[in-house]
Amino acid sequence: MLLRLELSALLLLLIAAPVRLQDECVGNSCYPNLGDLMVGRAAQLAASSTCGLYRPQNYCILGYLENERKCFTCDSRSPYNDYHNPSSHRIENIITTFQPERKMKWWQSENGVHEVSIQLDLEAMFQFSHLILTFKSFRPASMLVERSKDFGRTWKVFRYFAEDCANSFPGISEGPAHSIDDLVCDSRYSGAEPSTEGEVVLKALDPSFDIHDPYDSTIQGLITLTNLRVNFTRLLTLGDTLLTRRKRNPQDKYYYALYEMVVRGSCFCNGHASQCIPVDGARGDTFTEPGMVHGRCVCQHNTAGYNCERCQDFYHDAPWRPGGKADSDVCKRCNCHSHSEKCHFELARYLATGGVSGGVCDDCRNNRIGPQCELCGPFYYQDPQRSVDDPYACIPCDCDLDGSVDRGLCDPVNGQCVCKQNIEGERCDRCKVGFYGFSRDDPSGCQLCRCNFLGTIQVGNPCDPTTGRCICEHFAYGSQCDQCLPGYWGLGNTVYGCIPCDCDIGGALKTECSSVDGQCKCRPNMVGQKCNDPAPGYFLAPLDFYIYEAENAAPLAVISPFIGPPPFVYPTEGIPERPTKLPLCPPAPKPSSVPYREHITVQPSPAPHNPQVTLPMCEHYFRQRGYDFKISNGRLVVVKREKRQTRRRRQGQRTIPFEPGSPLQILLRQRANDQSITWTGLGFVRVQDGAGLRFTVSNIPATLDYYVVVRYEPESTDDWTAIVSILSIGSEDERCPNDQSNKMFTLPASGRTATLDLPVCLSDGNQYHVDITFRKQPSEDPHSSSFILIDSLGLIPKVESVPNFCSQSYLSQFQQYRCIELAVQAGGQTLPEVCEMLIGSMSAFIHNGAVSCNCHHVGAYGSSCSKFGGQCQCKPNVIGRCCDSCAPLTYGLGPNGCSPCDCDRSGSTTELCDQTTGQCSCRDGITGLQCNRCYPGYYGFPLCRRCQCNRLADICDPITGDCLDCREHSAGRNCERCEEGYVGDPVSGQPCEPCLCPDLNGSGRFFAFSCNKDPRSGAPYCECLPGHTGPQCDSCSPGFYGDLRLPGGRCKECCCNNNIDPRDGDACDPVTGECLRCLHNTEGPRCQSCKRGYYGNALAQDCKECSCDRRGTDDSKCPAGSPCFCDQDTGQCPCRPGVQGALCNECDDGYWNMDGDYGCQPCNCNREHALNYICDKITGQCLCQPEYGGRICDECGPNHFGNPDLQCMFCDCNLEGTVHPACDAYTGECLCKPGVTGPFCDECAPGHNNNFPACEPCHACNHLWEKIISDLSLDAERIETMMPCPEDFRSRPELQHLQNLLEKLQNVLNMGAQDELKKLEELLARIRNETEIIDPNIIIIDPTLLLNTDIDYIRLEFNKLLKNLREKAKEGPVTDIKAVNDIFNKIKKFYDEFTDSEKKVEAAKKVQEASRKTREKVTLELAKCQIGEMDKLERKVKALSAANINEEVCGAPGDAECEKAKCGGALCGKCGGPDCTGSLPISLNASKLAEMTEKNITALRSQLKEADAQLRNASEMTSYVKDQAENMMDKINRTKTKYEQEKTDTKALIEKVKTYLQDELVKPEDIEKLANAVLSIQLPKSPDEIKDMIEDIKKILANITEFNDDLEYLEKQAKIAGNMKERAKEILNRTELINVKEIEKALNDTAKLHDKIFNDLDEAEQNNDVIREKVNETEPKLKNIEDHLNLTRAKTLLDEIEALKNKTEMNRAQGKEAKDTADAALNSANDTGKDLEELKEQFEKLKLNSTNQNVSSEANERLKNITMEAENLAKHVEDKMKEIEDLEEKILLSNERKDEMRKELEALQKEADDLKKFIVDKVQRYNLCSP
């Protein structure tokens, strides 16, 4: 009964647990618990190798403990049982059972099998977490873990494990992994330690990587599996499997043994289940296997499948996905509104609905369609009274069959019928709006109304729904309202319907336009829709277009009785006149090289200021012959009379002169870019009172009334009167009767234009003379001018006289905007748009279209002109509307415009020049285009004087008067001396005669400076050039060469680099210059290199003999009797192969034996056994690995044995107890010394005492006792072996007696060494125990082998480090070669003295080496001697001759008596003597000589060190001074750059503030805003901070020089600061809302602070004087140091300056950023100012409310607080105003600092440039042959 209750409780627990777990899955992802996948799957677990599976097998373990059993038996034929079969080691033993004695069972493989696999097969897909393997044996040397996801069809490797990954798994990375799925080899779990219970751990996911998506395909591939396989590939052994000298089999100790294998995981449910059940068909032993992990998920979240990998049926409204935090949108139920029970998922619908629904219902009922059966089928629609779930909710459609489509199809939702295209209505029973004619036969149902919607009234239906007739808008007509009335357009082209044409009244021919596009019909050359724009190349003429310049008018006779008739002046050079007809600009004249066809110039005398031009006496003569006189460029010119000029003169026309003195005078006015032009044409005509002008008008465009306008400029304040008379020349015009009466109007002094009140009628086609006489009105001022400046005459059409032109409204606008008054003014004022439009229309009307631009093809940039006015774009100095004339004082109209005359005022009579040639009018004796030079033969412009050249030259320099092109071989400023190569006296008339040195000067063979006459003989003699000699300088001096027979030959200095005697005439070839007698051991055609056998710098006379070691030098380069041939530059000797060093005196790495017959020999070190290829350079011994030896490491080393080609093993012999080489090279048996025994020769042999390693023999009797005891022991052992068995043995008295006797004998024997014998007994007992428990075939593993290997590795690393240390020790400080040249010369003589000693030492070394080799051979032979070979050794010793040995050692045979033996002997107490040549005396002499040499070299080294220290001290001092100078320069440059930027920014800020504050229109509110912006800048507030700032400034200024030039600038800046202070005071006076008392006080304090700054600056200037003196003292020292520095100093300095410039640019950029920050702060301050204003306004309102109302106490308190805040704010503003003054001070100081820094930088730049020039000059000199 109790058992039944327990079983029931267990069932309830099992049922309740899943329910609780499933509740956790609601709304969240859930996962089954992890477990051991091995549990319950013993049948699915297999191993490829198991020990004792078919028969019992023996195996052993490794152990070193005594009395420990080492070998056991494995019998796995039956399962494991604690009592009956504990030796079973099947694979199921590794499944964890948590039993107390779980270490008593394990799985074990067969012995010596390397490749073994363990495989776990799962029944479904599982999720894998990690694997843990716990080994009983060593862990495998290499293994790998694989997984399968397809039940074993394919496998993938999880991870590799190996002790040596590179050898076990080549090509596999050893990590670390770069990504979570990287395949790497892990070496952490494959070592020899621990020997048992070692673990191998594999995690499916590396925890070092972050996992963002656990359902990523890569992650899923790592954690899911159906099969797991562990492959062991190689056993871990201790190396004894390779040994062959033992008898036992080592394989029995090596196998795989596992205590347990844990595979942690869970059933894979994709996050949709927390419980799993057994898979169908699997064992149902859930209750018998607790902890088993099953493979089928109990799915939640509406999922299904073994792994919950899909949705349940009818749950497809949301897609399946792995479990997440919120799983409400996974596998949702489909919504088919009860019309279907089947659905499927469509991704397209899911995406289209934005992830809301993806389920599509299948097989909808009740006339339903749609993804959710939510729609009615065709010809049905949803009944609005029923729900969607109602099976009767879809009802049939009710549509008009004539107006609907598809037999009455309707909308399935609202029942709306589907109408034809032009039908509407719920039942499709009427036409749409805009359509008419409902018809069954019409496919569209109704016809479209064809009305133009722009021309139709948009009210309701645009046409009748039955007839289709349209209803038109205004100005539209037609059956479809698609046409505009005449005078309108735009229907269909604009959005406004029919709009007026609005054609231009002047530009269009009529008011009507095209009804399509509104284009008006234009007059010629007019374009645009309204015809109001001129075509390209045309323009609209303004009102004042018809202008007649006064300069082109003819003079009228003087009418005043007080003024005489003006003198008759003939026409000057023609000025272009306006043409008589359009086009108004004439074509450009072709340029001509001469301005006149024929002229004769008569040069007059210089004219006074107001000259009266008089004709010459020959006037009558020229006039009779057809010539006339004219003034051109200030000269009276006779020109050929032309017919037109004659006709004009007959007509009484004359021109106006340029010269003063006449009633009329032309005044040209030059135009400037910065001057407004208030005149037209070239200038004015200055008209005297009573004089007049005649204007010829011949280009009237149309018969109209015109206003006469006169433009002028008065010279006084008096008004003038103009009398106008118009004379018609031509036929009369009835429309314009000729009125020749005089008309008068006033020219007021205050104006610039005057208009005749009444217009005059002028007809086109006629020519008119408009005569105007100017009279000055009476004036009270007697000194007022009687002249007036007349500019031009203008004709302005009267708008009212233009027939049928414009309406009264246009005329009213014309008058309202004063269009005529504005058009009359000169200067190109911009007219109002209304005036410009009306005038343009009138111009097009009058001229029948637009007027052609006619821009001059040379003077204008193009053919286009301005649309209104027609002004062309002129080139420089070109004027006129058409750009056809040169401006005054210019000439030569050409492609680049006109050129300025630039007449020299001191050489010309006027500023005018010929407009064609540009020739100015020159004074006497002056010529040139600009009258700027003297005539040839004269100089000294403008006071030209005749050249003084002693009649030997015709011209001279026009400025200095130096004569040019002197004749007759004369020279000099005044041709006062002879040329070089000539002798004479040109001043006294003595001609220049040639000198022959040896030929004439200029012949190429003149080799003298000059020649002179002998004062006695008068014969000329030569003064030879350097290098020439002889009476005629026709040969070269000694040390010079040259072939003087060739043209251009010269004697040049022989370039032999100072290596010849310059006094030796044969030192170089006199013709070729080749050096023949080189000195100082040099050779070559220029003595430029050292002789063979010498090296050094031949240019510095420093060629030294080569000192090559002949042993290591190439024999072909070392001839007998002469030094070896080394490199002539470096002294490097030509070494034999394998030899190195400058003198070829040492072997190269990899070579040895310098004393060999052929130099150094290769080491030939064994590549496999040597540590490197380098050997000892004397002995040739290679550096071997620890286990190898021999000279080239081709033998096993000491204490090692074996085949060196395969492996050398450690003998482990005790070196103190062995003889060389410690053990047998083939068997490894230790070779013990006599008296030593043991397998390792580490103990004394029997019969010897125990004092190891001495092991002295015992007494002779000891051998007898030892033999007796040994025999007895053998008998006792024999007796024991004869016993049947130990159990049946019974002690007998006889045997017991014998045993006792044996013990007594042993005690007797041990009386001498009892302790030692006891140890031997213990050792014997241990040996017996080991013999009993150890297999006879076992190999004893010595653990010291591993320790020795580690020691060898440490030794190898130490040798490498030692080698690196030696190489670095060889590197010494590099000393400048030039610095030690002098010291090296001293070494040279010491070296010569030591060379002989060195050779003696080398000879002694050879003898020593031979002696050492002899000793080594003897030692080696002695070591090889064995006890059994002593007779051989004795024979060899007897064969030795003492006399011979004595002779080799001491120098003489030792057979003589000691008194007679001069060299002594072995028995004489001495060896060697003065003349003895034995090895010992030679060695002693060599040692003494070596000691002396070492002392001398040590002394020399000391001297070298002292010299090197002095050089270093000098270099350090130089570097220190240089660094100090550079630091000062850097500091100056940085400071200058910083303040230069601050100065620029500060100046810009001050200018902006000054400009703003000086504006009188600035309001006080704006000033306050500006003050707030400035006050927002945080500056030092307290006087102490300001003082600290000034002290910092003084410290900076103390390191800067040259203040004097800046003090004046500082005073100016102080004045500016004072002005700024006054301006600030004005600002404060204007700021009424701010209390200014504190600000005024702050300003006064600022003034005092200014004075203090001045005092501080004076003190700084005094300090500067002291610094300047120190700098002056330092400059010579710096200069000397710079001279001794390398030539790269200049380049370094320039690079540093360039770096400073770059830093300056960086500081400038930072300054700009600071300025931007300041601007941002300023804007912020402005915003703050606005907030302050708003606060003040609110405050005023609050005050007003408080006075008008009775408020509560709380409101009053609030008002009080606000008042206090406002007062505090006002005080804050006052404080900020004080900070403004501080800012001004800082700005001034910054400006001063910037200027000072700039000057310092300029001085440093100049110093650098000078230094660079100096260095370049030095380099150029050094590059020459001689300095």
Swiss-Prot record:
Signal sequence coordinates: 1-21
Glycosylation sites: 231, 1001, 1329, 1485, 1496, 1513, 1533, 1599, 1629, 1644, 1672, 1686, 1702, 1726, 1745, 1750, 1761
Domain Laminin IV type B per the UniProt entry, residue ranges: 540-847
Pfam (any one): LAMB4
Main location: secreted
Region annotation (Domain I) ranges: 1477-1827
Record keywords: Basement membrane, Cell adhesion, Coiled coil, Disulfide bond, Extracellular matrix, Glycoprotein, Laminin EGF-like domain, Repeat, Secreted, Signal
Name of the protein: Laminin subunit beta-4
Organism this protein belongs to: Danio rerio (Zebrafish)
Source lineage: Eukaryota, Metazoa, Chordata, Craniata, Vertebrata
Gene of this entry: lamb4
